[in-house]
Curated annotation (Swiss-Prot):
Protein purpose: Seems to not be involved in heat resistance. Unable to mediate restriction of long-distance movement of the pathogenic tobacco etch virus (TEV) without causing a hypersensitive response or inducing systemic acquired resistance.
Main location: membrane
Domain annotation sHSP: ranges: 14-121
Entry keywords, A to Z: Cell membrane, Membrane, Plant defense, Repeat, Transmembrane, Transmembrane helix
Organism, as annotated: Arabidopsis thaliana (Mouse-ear cress)
Gene name for this UniProt entry: RTM2
One GO biological process term: defense response
Name this protein carries in UniProt: Inactive protein RESTRICTED TEV MOVEMENT 2
Membrane topology, from the record: Single-pass membrane protein
S-S pairs: none
Chain segments carrying region 6 X 5 AA repeats A of L-E-E-[SKR]-[ERK]: 129-220
Cellular location(s): Cell membrane
Amino acid sequence: MAARQQQKGTGFGVQYEDFVPKSEWKDQPEATILNIDLTGFAKEQMKVTYVHSSKMIRVTGERPLANRKWNRFNEVFTVPQNCLVDKIHGSFKNNVLTITMPKETITKVAYLPETSRTEAAALEKAAKLEEKRLLEESRRKEKEEEEAKQMKKQLLEEKEALIRKLQEEAKAKEEAEMRKLQEEAKANEEAAAKKLQEEIEAKEKLEERKLEERRLEERKLEDMKLAEEAKLKKIQERKSVDESGEKEKILKPEVVYTKSGHVATPKPESGSGLKSGFGGVGEVVKLAEEKLGNLVEKEKKMGKGIMEKIRRKEITSEEKKLMMNVGVAALVIFALGAYVSYTFCSSSSSSSSSSPSSSSSSTKPE
């Protein structure tokens, strides 16, 4: 038989090369001998099996080649009818596998007539045809089994690939969701931090504005207090000046010219008139001063507490009223002082203008 080769892959990167080894039958009187040429194979790389159901001998083997390739064969041979199955034996020598199949009846081919030889040749030909048919059927079955196995393997690989793809998609989806949740959590955290920072800044600005307002209020109150103290001091100074001028005017003697000379006499009428004229104003000024003094003393006693309450914005309506009264009293005293000063000045000027006329009338000679 001529050898033929065929390449097959398994999907794992290993390739098999199938081939049909050369075989030769020899018919001897004692036995039928089958020689198979297996060059390149070792004894351990082949296997011979007798199949009782089909009365056939199966010879298989495989050996590795280079680049992940394997060389293999699978041959089936029909056992002759008059063969002793229990005595079949084989040997491997010089790359040739020899299978000896002893016969039940020893034939002497040399002494057979011509007709017997023809029948033997026909039988041998029929046996070879049957062997060929069985071999082809066996190969067809093996091919079908191999295709079924390959199809099953392919389906299994496709199933595994599909499962692997689904797992990868699920993992990618899970990672995307996890990444999205992390980004959302980070964004929420940043937004919360930003909002908290804005609230802190707004609170600080509010505190600064309140503090500035308190400072302005304290400054205004301090300015008001200083202004009131200055007004009070000015009123007191004017009062002292007015009182000294009034006393000097009351005690100043009036000069009366007579024949004997001029005589200085006091003028009680002027004093009484001045007293009667300015008595009401003096009493009002005195009452205003007493009230202002009481309010100032009370403010001095409570001043520290009021200023502290103003800073804290805890001042009561009564304390506000007290501060307003202090301001009003100061203004009243200032107005009364101005009025008194104006009145005294007017009185002084009128008295001065009337003195020369009286003196001229009194110095008229008799």
